[in-house]
């Protein structure tokens, strides 16, 4: 058998395998913020679906700790274990985009870490994470923007 036929067969197999996996584990775009039209099962008032290696997950955990909010941490495996839990059948029911973190507050999922930070801060204004002075608020905004990793293009900052 000619080698070009073998090569085309192997390439076709890998392309087809990739397309099948992509179809089986498809994700959907979501908008950030509280999802009033969605609900998720919950056991605790606050449940954070996150990964310890995720920058966005860590900043949400820091905000929850800083505000003194009691929450249940649900570790979602990414690439470090090879299980790719964000592409499993379970996690996309919580967040159809397959991205972490997701905060579930009494059954309502909240997507996008910066939106989660705003939500957390709005819960108790007596101990706000955002400074009162306009200059300090602007400084916080600059840092949030600098540290933002948009889910639409998480690797875009490398360009």
Residue positions per predicted region:
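GST-like domain detector, emphasizing the conserved glutathione-binding G-site
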Residues: 2-159
